Amino acid sequence: MFEAVTPLLDEHAELERRLADPAVHADAALARTLGRRYAELGAVVVAHAAWRAAADDAEAARELAAEDAAFAAELPALQRAAEEAGEKLRRLLLPRDPDDSRDVILEIKAGEGGEESALFAGDLLRMYLRYAERHGWVTEVLDANPSDLGGYKDVSVAVKTRGAAAEGVWHRLKYEGGVHRVQRVPVTESQGRVHTSAVGVLVVPEAEEVEVAVDPNDLRVDVFRSSGPGGQSVNTTDSAVRITHLPTGVVATCQNEKSQLQNREQAMRILRARLHALAQEAADAQASAARRSQVRTVDRSERVRTYNYGENRIADHRTGFKAYNLDTVLDGDLDPVIQSAIDADEAAQLAATSV
């Protein structure tokens, strides 16, 4: 049982040996990649050891149960513990999203609803920043286009873990991509009527510079003056940067920093992440239908959830999750909502595979 564990245990031991070599740490990118994989496999090693111990305890009790009533009484609980440990290990052995240990770039864009949508985009930004704070993640606003009333027409944020982690930011935030709908009375509404607005969220794994080779000849770089609420110029120099990748048409813009050089660096980070995501989508499209069902069981391009302020209700339309604690969710208590998507994804994979 669990024959697939053996090569993973061997890989974990080999990574431990390599990470003990000081020469590996001379290459920061390599050390980070190996460290993340080591942490990911470490969870499998621990779960396998726990399952073996629980299975051995249950087997020993089973052998002694015929002779000793005390062991017979303990057997059901020991068998349940072994089954639960096996289920945890089985989930860890599911095909892993290769980007799960990565950091992300999260983009929030106001959509249907005008200024109210922009205000809700600001509310979502605060929610994600508070959620990141709860997890000890590091956030950095890469670009922001504020609206007249203090919301955001669009905003891009980098979210990073501190050091190597088996479950990176992408592991949890990848389920946030899609359309988020809000139902509430806007601050601009004088009659007290409830309006429905929508905000789009895009989450892409951040790519290392060495992973996405970009030919400078494939880029068109435009510079312009940064603008603030209402479109007024907030800088007297052409510091804002727009980079277009000509072969794909992918565009990244940044005007958040004071210097053109800084904005160009941030725009390139966004561009690399988008190109990486584009390449991953192409690879998924070429995969078999069965494989796609394993790695993309929760569609991140569809309507994600509804936030109803009047009822203090949040509802996830993909998983059926519903709760009446919208105020705490908007304050960063997102884990139960996201966990419902993770559980649904893993359940679908378990149903489609035999691990």
UniProtKB/Swiss-Prot annotation:
InterPro entries: PCRF (IPR005139), Pep_chain_release_fac_I (IPR000352), Pep_chain_release_fac_I_sf (IPR045853), Prokaryotic/Mito_RF (IPR050057), RF-1 (IPR004373)
Subcellular location: Cytoplasm
Biological role: Peptide chain release factor 1 directs the termination of translation in response to the peptide chain termination codons UAG and UAA.
SUPFAM superfamilies: Release factor
Name listed for the protein in its UniProt record: Peptide chain release factor 1
Keywords: Cytoplasm, Methylation, Protein biosynthesis
Pfam families tied to this protein: PCRF, RF-1
Post-translational modification as stated in the protein's UniProt record: Methylated by PrmC. Methylation increases the termination efficiency of RF1.
Gene Ontology CC terms: cytoplasm
Residue numbers carrying N5-methylglutamine: Q232
GO molecular function, one term: translation release factor activity, codon specific
UniProt family annotation: Belongs to the prokaryotic/mitochondrial release factor family.
Species annotation: Kineococcus radiotolerans (strain ATCC BAA-149 / DSM 14245 / SRS30216)
Superkingdom in the source lineage: Bacteria
PROSITE patterns: RF_PROK_I
Gene3D superfamilies membership: 3.30.160.20, 3.30.70.1660, 6.10.140.1950
Keyword Cytoplasm on entry: yes
